[in-house]
Regions:
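N-terminal, active-site-proximal structural segment of metallo-dependent hydrolase catalytic domains
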Residues: 1-57, 72-75, 205, 307-311
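Active-site environment of divalent metal-dependent phosphoester hydrolases
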Residues: 15-16, 46-50, 124, 161-162, ...
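Surface polyanion/phosphate-binding segment centered on an Asp-His-Pro turn
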Residues: 284-311
Length: 311
């Protein structure tokens, strides 16, 4: 049987599952109809008990839940909803063990799935330093996991647009976290330059270099590591690989008419190993039909993977 994986930043699970009116029924109603077998959730912003309470109707219908809350209450938090029990569950990465930003487990079929919530950052603040530190810790783990788990998908809110095509108004966002040169260079190092032959020119002269709170000296530990596009990547942006020029946006600010005007950002990704990319059949975003029907500022990103022959 095929395996469908969804990834979505729920923007607070208690708010996402709230029924607002007879038309806006929230995430629980979406779970009743989704084709997903696994839902990778980010920004859960709840304790384990609160998350189980919010999702109780879905759990009663057979969904199983694992969560990794952030130590700081009301912040971050990741979770995995699955129709099958997970084994070999792991939370956190070095330096961010209790930050509620990474959770992985293996399905009975052998596919390993992970939910990632990368720090959002904020240019010229300590939050951007935190984001760069996370990237530095995360990058070597990607190489380890690709070798250890040939069939693995890391879905989540990466909080970075890789290419100009990944946001509506790229020219006005060149100095904002989520589209800074070091962030985009990180994505190049993970996914390569596809579909371009070479990486896009990301060293905008008005915004090149460091954008954290502290200007580090060359070679200092805090300086974002120089990165180049991977010639032979171990991870693949599934949506972009399946739709080289048309991968849709996944996030729209609540401000103004961004949703109605489709002024969005593509910051949610499913990163797959080569074996999983070979199984990927189709990818799509389930965008709400109207702004008042949204239960998060993100929309679910889904990918259907063909049967891999596991038990």
């Amino acid at each position: 049987m095929s395996l469908t994986i969804a990834s979505v930043n729920v923007n607070g699970i208690r708010a996402a599952t709230k029924v607002r009116n007879e038309d806006s029924l929230g995430m629980l109603e979406w779970l009743q109809h989704t084709s997903a077998d696994v839902v990778l959730m980010q920004e859960v912003r709840a304790t384990e008990e609160q998350a189980h309470a919010a999702l109780a109707p879905a759990l009663d219908e057979g969904w199983q839940l694992v969560v990794a809350p952030a130590e700081a209450k009301g912040r971050a938090g990741v979770g995995i909803l699955s129709k099958h029990s997970l084994i070999d569950v792991h939370t956190g990465i070095p330096g961010f063990e209790t930050a509620g930003r990474f959770l992985a487990g293996t399905l009975p079929c052998g596919t390993r799935v992970a939910s990632l919530y990368l720090p959002s950052g904020a240019a010229e603040t300590a939050k951007q330093d935190e984001k760069y530190e996370f990237l530095d810790q995360f990058e070597p783990l990607l190489a380890e996991w690709a070798a250890q788990y040939p069939q693995m998908v890391i879905g989540g809110d990466w909080n970075i647009c890789h290419r100009r095509e990944d946001l509506k108004n790229w020219k006005t966002n060149r100095k904002k976290s989520g589209f800074l040169p070091p962030e985009r260079a990180f994505m190049d190092s993970v996914f390569g330059a596809f579909p371009d032959d070479e990486a896009q020119d990301i060293e905008d002269k008005a915004n090149a270099g460091w954008a954290g709170a502290v200007e580090y000296g060359a070679g200092d530990a805090g300086d974002p590591a120089p990165r180049t596009a991977a010639a032979e990547p171990a991870w693949f942006d599934v949506a972009r690989r399946l739709s080289p020029e048309a991968a849709p946006y996944t996030w729209w600010t609540y401000r103004g008419q961004a949703f109605n005007n489709d002024a969005g950002w593509r910051i949610d990704y499913q990163a797959a190993t080569a074996d999983m990319l070979a199984r990927a059949q189709r990818s799509w975003v389930e965008k709400a039909g109207a702004v008042e029907l949204r239960w998060s500022d993100h929309s679910p990103l889904l990918v259907e993977y063909a049967d891999g022959g596991g038990a």
